[in-house]
C-alpha cells in the first residue's frame, strides 16, 4: 500500500497512538572521524532538511528545527548511520564511527508510533520508513511535529529482518544534547567487540577486514 500525503489539517495527528520513550535506552551511532581528519566527539546532531531532500534523512525538518536518529539496538543504530545495508561492511567504516547508549530521561514525551496499525486510516504505511520518497516522508515528519510530537518510533529502512526499530527525535537544528527533557546519560559502546559483531551478523551485516574481499556472488 503506497504512502499517502499527511493530513493537511492542524491537529489531525494529535491522537496518533504513542510509544513510551521515558526510562528506556536508545543507541546513537555517528561518524566520529571525518575524512578531513576532524574528530566529532559529541554524538548529538540534529539535521535540518537540505535543498536536496535525498541528501538528508527521511525525517529531517526544515530549519531552524532538526532531527537526530537513534535506534533501540546497536545493529539498528549502525544501519541508521550507514543509510545502506552492507552485507560486507569494511572494518574501517565501522572503526570511524562512535556509539553510545543513551538513557532517555523521565521527562521525554512519548513518540508517535509509526508501527501502530491505526495509522493506516490516515494513509500512513511502512513506506514512511521503508520507502525512498524523501520529500514525502519529510512532510510526514513536519506534520507530526506540527501536531506537537517530539519524536517518531518506527522501522529502519535497510533492516532486512523487519524487526529493528528506530527513534527520531526532534529539536533545534545543530550539535547539542536534546533540550526539552533533561540530561541524557551516555555510556560508550565498542562497535568492534564480539557482541556487536554478532548482533550485526544476525541482521545480515558481516565485518570485512583490510584485504578481505567479499565473497563472489553465486552464479
Which residues make up each language-model segment?
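Active-site and NAD+-binding cores of ADP-ribose-processing enzymes
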Residues: 1-56, 84-219
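Extended catalytic/binding region for NAD+/ADP-ribose chemistry, centered on the ART fold
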Residues: 56-88
Amino acid at each position: 500500500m503506497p504512502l499517502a500525503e499527511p493530513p493537511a489539517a492542524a491537529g489531525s495527528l494529535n491522537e496518533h497512538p504513542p510509544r513510551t520513550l521515558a526510562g528506556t535506552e536508545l543507541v546513537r551511532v555517528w561518524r566520529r572521524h571525518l575524512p578531513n581528519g576532524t574528530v566529532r566527539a559529541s554524538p548529538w546532531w540534529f539535521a535540518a532538511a537540505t535543498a536536496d531532500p535525498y541528501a538528508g534523512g527521511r525525517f529531517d525538518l526544515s530549519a531552524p528545527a532538526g532531527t537526530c536518529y537513534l535506534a533501540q539496538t546497536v545493529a539498528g543504530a549502525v544501519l541508521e548511520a550507514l543509510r545502506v545495508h552492507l552485507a560486507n561492511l569494511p572494518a574501517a567504516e565501522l572503526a570511524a564511527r562512535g556509539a553510545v547508549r543513551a538513557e532517555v530521561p523521565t521527562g521525554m514525551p512519548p513518540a508517535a508510533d509509526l508501527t501502530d496499525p491505526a495509522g493506516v486510516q490516515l494513509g500512513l504505511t511502512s513506506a514512511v520508513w521503508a520507502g525512498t520518497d524523501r520529500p514525502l516522508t519529510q512532510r510526514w515528519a513536519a506534520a507530526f511535529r506540527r501536531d506537537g510530537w517530539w519524536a517518531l518510533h518506527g522501522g529502519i529502512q535497510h533492516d532486512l529482518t523487519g524487526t529493528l526499530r528506530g527513534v527520531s527525535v526532534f529539536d533545534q537544528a545543530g550539535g547539542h544534547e536534546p533540550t526539552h527533557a533533561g540530561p541524557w546519560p551516555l555510556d560508550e559502546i565498542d562497535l568492534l567487540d564480539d557482541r556487536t559483531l554478532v548482533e550485526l551478523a544476525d541482521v545480515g551485516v558481516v565485518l570485512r577486514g583490510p584485504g578481505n574481499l567479499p565473497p563472489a556472488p553465486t552464479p
